[in-house]
Amino acid sequence: MVSVKAYYNETVETVRRDLNGEQYKDFLVLILIVSAVVSLFLGETESAAVILVVITMNAILGTVQTIKAENSLESLKQLAAPEAKVVRNGAVVRIPGREITVGDVVHLEAGDYIPANGRVLESASLKVDESALTGESIGVDKISAPLTGELPLGDRRNMVFSGSYVTYGRGVFLVTGIGMNTEVGKIAGLLKNTSEKKTPLQINLDRFGKKLSMIILLLCAVLFALQVLKGGAVADAFLFAVALAVAAIPEALSSIVTIVLAFGTRKMAKEGAIIRKLQSVEGLGSVSVICSDKTGTLTQNRMTIEHYYVDGRDIPADQIDPANPLQEQMLKFSILCNDSTNVEGQEIGDPTETAMVNLGDKKGISAQEVRDACPRSSEIPFDSDRKLMSTFHKMKDGYTMITKGAVDVMLKRVDYIQKGGKIFPVTEVDVENICRVNEQYSESGLRVLGIGYRHFPVEKNISTEDEQGLVFLGLLAMMDPPRTESAAAVSDCKRAGICPVMITGDHKVTAAAIAKRIGILDDISQACEGVQIDGMSDEELNEFVENIRVYARVTPEHKIRIVRAWQERGNIVAMTGDGVNDAPALKQADVGVAMGITGTEVAKDAASMILTDDNFATIIKAVESGRNIYENIKKAIQFLLSGNFAAILVVIAASLMNLPVPFAPVHLLFINLLTDSLPAIALGLEPYHHDVMGKKPRPVKESILTKEFLIRVGVEGGVIGAVVLTAFLIGYRDGNEVLAGTMAFAVLCLSRLLHGYNCKAGKPVIFTGGFFDNRFMQGAFLSGFVLLTAVLAVPVLHGFFAVQTLKIGELLAVYGLSGVSMLVIQGLKRMVKF
């Protein structure tokens, strides 16, 4: 939620959700509440109490997990409370950023956070990091000159924006917008109008709960009517109907799903993914499109030198040799004409300049030693209009001015070129070769700078007039390279039937180059810019997105439209982002993924998952976990429904055969809540299988209750129901209802404990192995068996559970019939492979 504070320069205020209330919105939980009320009305206080305990446990589990995730989020937040330097009464004073108002004149220097939107009045090499708004970490050079036309935010160089900060230089700006009237405020407005989506599992469980409730009501009504028509007492008919309802409702399902998802979040947290919204764990398994930011997610978020062009040769960075005089000169000159430093591994300065220092460090050239040997005495700072930077140094053999900057600008000031160890007048052929290489580098998405120099006989304070008659030394080409694991992650993505899409604020050429290198893009025709989207209707965009893999120079509005277009085509969409500009799309996506390291507070609050390593590959691991969790939840549901179906069949059969009600409600609740829950949880924690990533995402509308699934439930429930009815008939041969109920209860309980092994996988574990690969299942079986034994063997419990002591022969019958049910189902799985 977003609130606006009047009169103050404040944008968004995060409000915690009603975490406990959210746990009671699930449809199955509502069914349990109704069943508890009915049980209480019929005098079954024990049943009602147990059901209410289950509901409360489920709410506590969900709330605790969500709070833990929220606390993990809090540990990632590093909130800034900036002050601002403004002109008040003719003097520059510091005031809290929230007190700034339109019309204030604000002074900026390196390290300052920009507290409001404004028009630049003065710029002394002012450079601003706008990555929170544009997603691009390279600083933007600010100017005071007017600009014309409608420009994207990243190109409005005479404006500064709230949410960004100064990385270099100084400046002054006039405040033109505060609070909700800033770019951040506009994004906050978009967040208001973006609703969160339910995951496929939530939708499936809602549908399942509604269908199940209708089936239960219908069966109860039919059974009640049959009993009354047969002349039975209304009270007895009601008892049959209640027994059927209790047998049919999987009371523990909601708790089991919550526990399985919670365990999944723990595993994913160890792999670098913090889950803020529990249901998102499974939602990841349904993802069919991943819209990823480029900078820092697919790339290293660290500018790196890729190539040198020296002495007429292209030299890849890994082949640069400091033993070569010209290459050594390039390394040293790029360090000298440079303001960045590397202090104990911490890079300080402009990313393009730190790339030069880092390369020198890799090649064994210390920046500090080079600078100490060739001290700087004067400089001409970089200017965005001039596009050059020059520094003046005392060398062993005299004085040298080193100049670096845009290639086209530098070539106009070059008169000479260094080849080998000699200097020659530059020729048209030399210029053509340099321009050709520069164009090749640029088309590959590389940022290119030229390095030149000029010797002076004496020391002087250089000026722009001295930036003439330069000797061209070479080109250096750099980029923010892909993460080493990005290409493999994209390949895994495609193998899993997931479409990877890059959405970035960077330029199209750069984005396309990175996308090609990691396998997202096959052809440049699959890349477009945000301005192309502006002229499209929603219907046109829905068709357009299918063929586009890279979107460049996009706005927050573009991102939302792209996500919605994919969703309109029936896809489950994951969206990554780290900036304030990403927040609306993160919320719109089915699964919003924020960056934990570089992400802003607003982005993290809008997301359902946070990556602690900002790595695209971690998303793929999370998708794999989500798919495995869904498969395991299906196994748990299959286990619960087949066991409940067995109990339903026995109750209906007893009614049709004019036999007493086979189970007391407490029998079924004991089974459903204890001996059933443990194996179901164990199934939810089955070992993960990597083969899930070799399949396409399941269809969005695919129900859990598929034809094949229902057949398995029906067959397995029928087998278990048959042996339970047999046990009931054996116990009832002398008309002893308590003995019959005890044997039916014991066989149903033990058969369902063994049935956990039947549901482990598609293969029969007895014949093919895998019986002992899940320690949770061993613990579940032993725990359930001990609980059943205690109920049957401890006399003080007999009254509460409506059972009696079994003789040796009766116990053997219980064990034998339970074992038969498992062997029959395992045999059917081996023969029919259902």
Regions flagged by a language model, labelled:
Residues M1-G694, I704-L705, G718, F745, ...:
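Conserved cytosolic headpiece of P-type ATPases
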Residues N338, G570, V623, R627, ...:
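Alpha-helix capping/termination and helix-coil
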Residues S655-A664, F728-A740:
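Helix-coil boundary and interhelical linker segments in multi-pass alpha-helical membrane proteins
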Residues T675, I720, T742-G756:
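Generic alpha-helical transmembrane segments
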Residues P699-G718, V738-T742:
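Membrane-water interface at loop-to-transmembrane-helix junctions
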